[in-house]
Amino acid sequence: MTRYDEKKQLKCSFCGKSQEQVKRLVAGPGVYICDECIELCSEIIEEEFEDTKIDAEVSEIPKPKEIKEILDQYVVGQDAAKRSLSVAVYNHYKRINSDVKTTDIELQKSNIVMLGPTGSGKTFLAQTLAKILNVPFAIADATSLTEAGYVGEDVENILLRLIQAADYDIEKAEKGIIYIDEIDKIARKSENPSITRDVSGEGVQQALLKILEGTLASVPPQGGRKHPHQEFIQIDTTNILFICGGAFDGIDKIIQNRIGKKSLGFGAKIESSKDKDVGQLLKDILPQDLLKFGLIPEFVGRLPIVVTLQSLDKKALVQILTEPKNALVKQYQKLFEMDDVLLEIQDEALEHIAEKAIERNTGARGLRAILEEAMLGVMYDIPSMTNVEKCIIGKEVIAEHSEPELILNENRKSLKKAGAKRTRVKKESVS
């Protein structure tokens, strides 16, 4: 109820001061609040908000060993890459949470470039890191970017994806991770600067420099091109971690040529290119090799941490199919389980899936496609069959696209009764 004093003047419902004693009274449904009480409430809320903000900032960052242990649960192999990424990410977020303003030492940002063949796990590693740290994550394709003023996407659209991933919470987005894929595709065509305009190569590298280093960027809220009569979202990229990935096809030859040039003279040990595989050569990469490949010096300078990934062999691909928490085989078993069917994929079948992926040169990325091809028929039929208890995938199902073996239970609806009759059949004999 509205409160009045003895002179029937309006009073604050909280502190009791009259209209004459305060600067302003704000009316609510049956109550009034004065400007002094509003200010006091504002201070209380701000103090509580600051406390929660400080708690969030100093929240414990996982140690490099802890980050790697979590990565091991999801990513098979690539131990050297996981160690490098764990240290780099730990140092990055330690830098954000540290009170650098109180010291004379400025901790600079260290972005990451990942080199590795297709399907070696570059994108998945970046996604898993963001999941571990619980920060917003966005993926961009470098091939769709062009220099400002040309047909294609502006580099600021990358930041819009991160803002959207953070539900438009700018403060949260400013501590996120952006993965730029196919970064090798924006290399300039030759090591020497071009006299012609390269809007999708060197031009994009130049456009990315500022946001990689750290700047206050203006992002169009609806994406697309900027124009002078629209509002922009302001975002500071200083604390955003950029991870750039690419296959860098052919860079192994650049490294080999550099190493080969040192092997001159009578006493020199000469190594042929066959002595080292691509993965081993990538371990010897230097910034000058990236320059030779076509990245400009300023761009390479903003990606000081170089992480290399190895090609996945047959053993690693089989492990990827079965061991991680979200392994493909476990995913398919879960799908079949939803139809009350057990799925068994035999070891010989798993090995043949890995061999096919190596033949296709698709790495881990191609494993799902191979499984889908082989199991499309049975996944189409089983939901309509009420008496299937188990599905067994052998090598011939993968190699020859033959039908899997099904174990039927003719009395499926009364399985709890003793002696339920079970039969083994090939899928062709099931109507």
From Swiss-Prot:
Kindly list the biological process annotations in GO that this record carries.
Answer: cell division; proteolysis involved in protein catabolic process
Q: Which Gene3D superfamilies match?
A: 1.10.8.60, ClpX chaperone, C4-type zinc finger domain, P-loop containing nucleotide triphosphate hydrolases
Membrane-spanning regions, if any? none
Give each disulfide bond as a residue pair.
Answer: none
* UniProt xrefs under PROSITE patterns: CLPX_ZB (PS51902)
Q: Which residues form the ClpX-type ZB domain?
A: 1-53
Residues that, per the record, bind Zn(2+) = 12, 15, 34, 37
| The keyword Chaperone is annotated on this UniProt entry | yes
UniProt keyword terms in alphabetical order: ATP-binding, Chaperone, Metal-binding, Nucleotide-binding, Zinc
Q: Which family does the UniProt entry place this protein in?
A: Belongs to the ClpX chaperone family.
Summarizing the function annotation, the protein's role is: ATP-dependent specificity component of the Clp protease. It directs the protease to specific substrates. Can perform chaperone functions in the absence of ClpP.
Task: State what protein this is by name.
Answer: ATP-dependent Clp protease ATP-binding subunit ClpX
Species name for this entry? Ruminiclostridium cellulolyticum (strain ATCC 35319 / DSM 5812 / JCM 6584 / H10)
